[in-house]
């Protein structure tokens, strides 16, 4: 069993292994087996499409947490140019679980902010596995205020298990930092686009998620609590997480029906981790198109629509 593949992806892993073996044999033996290679490629594409066309909610949640799934720092060099990272909250520290800075999207200057989990063990520890402390959210707000001052659009990438629940974070005002971001983002006088690229966990995600347009990748997840946390509370058993996922309705299609997100961004066959370049091109075009729409509005209309959308969350529509 290949640990870089999820359980339901093992048939894909086996076929990819055979395909790589065939390619190596062809290179070493100088035998032309291009027809067989193409046949296996076609079979692999069909198999991947079949598996990913019928994923359960739990399987989608697993894809959202895939060990190879692209993070914020994977997307930035593919989507933006001239990225200049900015550091610190000017109050306490520089939280590496939040990255942000100025960049160019086409001919536009933008402020890019996102959660970052880290790829290897050292990076994961230094970035606290993508779980921000209060100083991370205050850094994000500082950058948003800077963007507002210079009339620069804000683009956020959401990918976190949740805000860090440690004692130190609570002492430094974790709940206040999150609440302040919600309050300020609701009326920030510049266009805001938020995109859930992996897992969006609770208030830790929402603190970057108040926006004019909320996008979500096809195999992302967005929820008030992690499935394991929900299962532990409801059933006293984290092993019930699979059932909790269905109840929580964490997937993009379910959230779109509830009008909790605005746009679902289609991923490459087999998920974003299979083709980061293609996924980045799709996001690049989606951001440009949406900024054209948002910047065509006057400020008062855009903020009014943002507030109306927020007020509509959770409306009871009847039986």
UniProtKB/Swiss-Prot annotation:
Record's catalysed reaction(s): N(6)-carboxybiotinyl-L-lysyl-[protein] + acetyl-CoA = N(6)-biotinyl-L-lysyl-[protein] + malonyl-CoA
Stored InterPro entries: Acetyl_CoA_COase_a_su, ClpP/crotonase-like_dom_sf, COA_CT_C
Domain of life, source organism: Bacteria
GO BP of this protein: fatty acid biosynthetic process; malonyl-CoA biosynthetic process
Pathway participation: Lipid metabolism; malonyl-CoA biosynthesis; malonyl-CoA from acetyl-CoA: step 1/1
EC numbers on record: 2.1.3.15
Keyword Lipid biosynthesis: yes
Domain (CoA carboxyltransferase C-terminal): residue spans on this chain: 36-293
Broad EC category: transferase
Alphabetical UniProt keywords: ATP-binding, Cytoplasm, Fatty acid biosynthesis, Fatty acid metabolism, Lipid biosynthesis, Lipid metabolism, Nucleotide-binding, Transferase
Function of the molecule: Component of the acetyl coenzyme A carboxylase (ACC) complex. First, biotin carboxylase catalyzes the carboxylation of biotin on its carrier protein (BCCP) and then the CO(2) group is transferred by the carboxyltransferase to acetyl-CoA to form malonyl-CoA.
NCBIfam families in the cross-refs: accA, AccA_sub, PRK05724.1
Protein name, entry field: Acetyl-coenzyme A carboxylase carboxyl transferase subunit alpha
Organism from which the protein derives: Dichelobacter nodosus (strain VCS1703A)
């Amino acid at each position: 069993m290949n640990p870089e593949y999820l359980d339901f992806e093992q048939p894909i892993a086996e076929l990819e292994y055979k395909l790589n073996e065939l390619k190596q044999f062809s290179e070493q033996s100088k035998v032309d087996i291009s027809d067989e290679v193409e046949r296996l490629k076609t079979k692999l594409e069909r198999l991947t499409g079949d598996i990913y066309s019928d994923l359960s909610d739990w399987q989608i949640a697993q894809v959202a947490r895939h060990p190879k799934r692209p993070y914020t720092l994977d997307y930035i060099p593919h989507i933006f140019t001239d990225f200049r990272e900015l550091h610190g909250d000017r109050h306490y520290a520089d939280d590496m679980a939040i990255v942000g800075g100025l960049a160019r999207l086409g001919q536009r200057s933008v402020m890019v902010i996102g959660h970052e989990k880290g790829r290897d063990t050292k990076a994961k520890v230094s970035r606290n596995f993508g779980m921000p402390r209060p100083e991370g959210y205050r850094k994000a707000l500082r950058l948003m205020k800077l963007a507002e001052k210079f009339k620069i659009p804000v683009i956020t990438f959401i990918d976190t298990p949740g805000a860090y629940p440690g004692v130190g974070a609570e002492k430094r005002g974790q709940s206040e930092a999150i609440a302040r971001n919600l309050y300020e983002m609701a009326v920030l006088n510049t266009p805001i686009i938020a995109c859930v690229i992996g897992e969006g966990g609770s208030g830790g995600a929402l603190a970057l998620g108040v926006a004019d347009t909320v996008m979500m990748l096809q195999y992302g997840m967005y929820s008030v609590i992690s499935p394991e946390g929900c299962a532990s509370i409801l059933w006293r058993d984290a092993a019930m997480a699979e059932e909790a996922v269905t109840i929580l309705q964490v997937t993009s299609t379910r959230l779109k029906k509830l009008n909790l997100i605005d746009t679902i961004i289609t991923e490459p066959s087999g998920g974003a981790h299979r083709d980061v370049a293609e996924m980045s091109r799709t996001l690049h075009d989606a951001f440009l198109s949406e900024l054209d729409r948002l910047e065509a509005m006057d400020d008062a209309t855009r903020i009014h629509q943002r507030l109306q959308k927020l007020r509509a969350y959770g409306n009871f529509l009847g039986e």
